[in-house]
């Protein structure tokens, strides 16, 4: 009877008048269906014996419901408990045995208690009061005031402060004034050509399109004419009002036009391109599976984050599928997922080319939308070859969306993307930090050797309780690893994030930092772009970046989405580092926000005492690094043994696999890497010299330039003429 009933109601849509008890719940699990079947059979026997008593039972059951209960059909589930995006790759991870560095540090006496000099009772009380103030500020940020209450409390506390704090503030003000007046070396303009007005008018869409889009203010997402499933996804994430970049970009993207958009970090650029994509895919053919959207990102972590944003925004859209193609994760699992031809594929350039060339049943021939996140980074020389290859593989008739916080690429770079009259939308002035970011600078002068001790001192001052998330940026991965060991020996737990880690280790580091298991994350510029981890309070630049753009992306990890944040930068004496500080001060002076740039007062005596502790532990640091190296060698040897066993055991299957191909040969790879290295070491010229060189190129071959040999011969001739002239004068006098 049960199967008859299922077949009977399979092709019909039940109405309100139908009896729901007779219709089985096909979405329930097997266990639930068995228990439900027993209950229903009892009810049927009761119904057969007592015909009219069933109605009374139903009425009694409805009487137990609360008449004041209302369903929230806006899909607001998870609004209050939303804790950021998930950094988990697709598929189950294979268990890998890694070296337990924290265990080694504990065996050597680290990670027990915070080391340091003894502080007076007054300093401890000040630290506790500062911690309490920071807690109040965090509560204010989570409410509707978004930091306004905290600012008023801070203003009141500043008025009621004692004389000692006044002295400290005076010292910091003097330092800030001194910082403004410092000569940061000769101001060199970067070798960046500016597009002429004629070129821009010919390449871009009329400027009034972007200006009109920026001038329209949207108070809610309902005014953007979005469909109900998309609005439910936004409500589930707690999004109520579109940010300026979202309000300006979404209507134009929905029209199918190409877009080049730029806004400060943390302004919601990912949702700005993901919302119109999901809205467009609502009207796709239901029975034809094909990849219609390709999203390219420069880093793996950013790709995983973008995929999670898309899944959460489109969770109420039926039939919407996502695929992930990033390096470091299981290649076979990604192949299986891409065989199903997901609607949206988020990828890094190298891995997507690998899948296009070597994965069966996957193609990008039907791509309708191309999104390039962090476009200025993707247009640099490091990704140029891969990007050109991808452009040759996807259809030229498509919509292209470019997004970045420092979008200042020239038309020459954009031509390769085959853009069609793109609309240019720049919400904020280029090269500007977030409005509520406080930028502090510490001048090292001749104290470069004290940097590890200074970092530990700053971490203790900024967060003595370990309840804040602090990101430390360094230039090299070896430095990041060594700093993790040093901080561990001083009693502070820290994580690391750089390219030498496996992808599983990188994701684990991000998740530990996100859950506050590790309050300090020491990383390279790998984490400087796009990562959106909620409530990063402080960013410390241990090493200065190479350019001001990289500096903006680093400090953009904090003060996101209207929150307040702080960055502390250690500044050396090089001209390059001084010029970055000068650009930061100029940007703050020209902005209308509440951000500021100032110097930070440091107690160098305490730093020197901490430095003595670090020096005393140098032998232990060497022992830890050596022990870790030996354990890594053992793990590598075990892996090679397993690899050899698999080669012998599955020799036929391995040999039967087709060889994976690449679009470049080994010699071409070497040549491109050499060209990239030469371009990086290219000397920066100022604007006058560049214009002179351009004028000489337009004229053709430049005039002959004298060599050193020519100058010496000319000098000799001049001396001879002088001697001859002197002898003639003597003869005339005689």
Swiss-Prot record:
Keywords: ATP-binding, Coiled coil, Helicase, Hydrolase, Nucleotide-binding, Nucleus, Ribosome biogenesis, RNA-binding
Helicase ATP-binding domain: residues covered: 250-425
Gene3D superfamilies: P-loop containing nucleotide triphosphate hydrolases
Biased composition (Acidic residues): 18-34, 118-140, 171-194
Biased composition, class Basic residues, residue ranges: 39-50, 680-691, 720-734
Motif extent (Q motif): 219-247
Amino acid composition bias (Low complexity), ranges on this chain: 148-158
Catalytic activity: ATP + H2O = ADP + phosphate + H(+)
GO CC list: nucleolus; preribosome, large subunit precursor
Pfam families: DEAD (PF00270), Helicase_C (PF00271)
One GO MF term attached to the UniProt entry: RNA helicase activity
Main localization (coarse): nucleus
Compartment(s) where it occurs, according to its Swiss-Prot or TrEMBL record: Nucleus, Nucleolus
Domain notes: The Q motif is unique to and characteristic of the DEAD box family of RNA helicases and controls ATP binding and hydrolysis.
Protein's name in the database: ATP-dependent RNA helicase DRS1
The species this protein was found in: Eremothecium gossypii (strain ATCC 10895 / CBS 109.51 / FGSC 9923 / NRRL Y-1056)
Biological classification of the source: Eukaryota, Fungi, Dikarya, Ascomycota, Saccharomycotina
């Amino acid at each position: 009877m049960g199967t008859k009933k299922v077949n009977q109601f399979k092709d019909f849509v039940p109405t309100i008048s139908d009896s729901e008890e007779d219709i089985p719940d096909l979405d329930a699990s097997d266990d639930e269906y068995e228990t439900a079947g027993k209950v229903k059979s009892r009810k049927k026997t009761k119904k057969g014996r007592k015909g009219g008593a069933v109605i009374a039972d139903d009425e009694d059951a409805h009487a137990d419901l609360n008449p004041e209960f209302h369903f929230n059909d806006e899909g607001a589930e998870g609004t209050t408990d939303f804790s950021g995006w998930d950094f988990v790759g697709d598929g189950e991870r294979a268990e890998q045995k890694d070296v337990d560095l924290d265990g080694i540090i504990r065996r050597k006496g680290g990670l027990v208690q915070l080391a340091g000099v003894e502080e007076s009772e007054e300093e401890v009380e000040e630290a506790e009061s500062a911690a309490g103030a920071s807690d109040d500020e965090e509560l204010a940020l989570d409410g509707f005031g978004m930091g306004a209450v905290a600012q008023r409390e801070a203003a009141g506390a500043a008025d009621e402060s004692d004389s000692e704090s006044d002295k400290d503030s005076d010292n910091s003000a003097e330092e800030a004034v001194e910082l403004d007046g410092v000569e940061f070396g000769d101001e060199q303009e970067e070798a960046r050509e500016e597009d002429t007005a004629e070129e821009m008018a010919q390449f871009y869409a009329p400027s009034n399109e972007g200006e009109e889009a920026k001038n329209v203010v949207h108070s809610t997402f309902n005014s953007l004419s979005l469909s109900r499933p998309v609005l439910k996804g936004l409500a589930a994430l707690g999004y109520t009002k579109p940010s300026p970049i979202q309000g300006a970009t979404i209507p134009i993207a929905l029209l199918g036009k190409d877009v080049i958009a730029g806004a400060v970090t943390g302004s919601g650029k990912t949702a700005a391109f993901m919302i119109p994509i999901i809205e467009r895919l609502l009207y796709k053919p239901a029975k034809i599976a094909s990849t219609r959207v390709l999203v390219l990102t420069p880093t793996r972590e950013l790709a995983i984050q973008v995929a999670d944003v898309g899944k959460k925004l489109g969770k109420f859209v039926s039939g919407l599928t996502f695929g992930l193609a990033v390096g470091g994760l299981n290649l076979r699992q990604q192949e299986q997922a891409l065989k199903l031809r997901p609607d949206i594929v988020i990828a890094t350039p190298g891995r997507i080319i690998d899948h296009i060339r070597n994965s069966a049943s996957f193609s990008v021939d039907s791509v309708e939308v191309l999104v390039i996140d962090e476009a200025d980074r993707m247009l640099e020389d490091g990704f140029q070859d891969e990007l050109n290859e991808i452009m040759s593989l996807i259809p030229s008739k498509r919509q292209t969306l470019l997004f970045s916080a420092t979008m200042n690429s020239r038309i020459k770079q954009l031509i390769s993307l085959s853009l069609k009259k793109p609309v240019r939308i720049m919400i904020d002035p280029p090269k500007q930090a977030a409005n509520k970011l406080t930028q502090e600078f510490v001048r090292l002068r001749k104290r470069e050797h004290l940097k590890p001790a200074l970092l530990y001192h700053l971490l203790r001052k900024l967060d003595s309780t370990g309840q804040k998330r602090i990101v430390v940026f360094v230039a090299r991965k070896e430095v990041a690893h060594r700093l993790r060991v040093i901080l561990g020996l001083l009693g502070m737990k820290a994580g690391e994030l750089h390219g030498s880690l496996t992808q599983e280790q990188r994701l684990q580091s991000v998740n530990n930092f996100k859950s506050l298991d590790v309050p300090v994350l020491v990383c390279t510029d790998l984490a400087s772009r796009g990562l959106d981890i909620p409530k990063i309070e402080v960013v410390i630049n241990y090493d200065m970046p190479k350019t001001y753009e990289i500096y903006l992306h680093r400090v953009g990890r904090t003060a996101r989405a209207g929150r307040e944040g702080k960055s502390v930068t250690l500044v050396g004496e090089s001209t390059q580092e001084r010029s970055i500080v000068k650009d930061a001060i100029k940007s703050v002076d020209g902005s209308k926000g509440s951000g500021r740039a100032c110097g930070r007062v440091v107690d160098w005596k305490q730093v020197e005492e901490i430095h003595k502790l670090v020096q005393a532990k140098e032998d232990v640091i060497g022992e830890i690094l050596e022990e870790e190296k030996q354990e890594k060698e053992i793990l590598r040897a075990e892996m090679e043994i397993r690899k050899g066993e698999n080669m012998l055991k599955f020799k036929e299957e391995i040999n039967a696999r087709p060889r994976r191909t690449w679009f470049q040969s080994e010699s071409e790879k070497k040549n491109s890497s050499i060209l990239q290295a030469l371009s990086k070491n290219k000397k920066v010229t100022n604007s006058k010299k560049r214009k002179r060189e351009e004028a000489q190129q337009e004229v053709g071959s430049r005039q002959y330039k004298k060599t050193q040999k020519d100058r010496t011969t000319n000098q000799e001739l001049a001396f001879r003429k002088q001697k001859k002239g002197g002898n003639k004068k003597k003869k005339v006098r005689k």
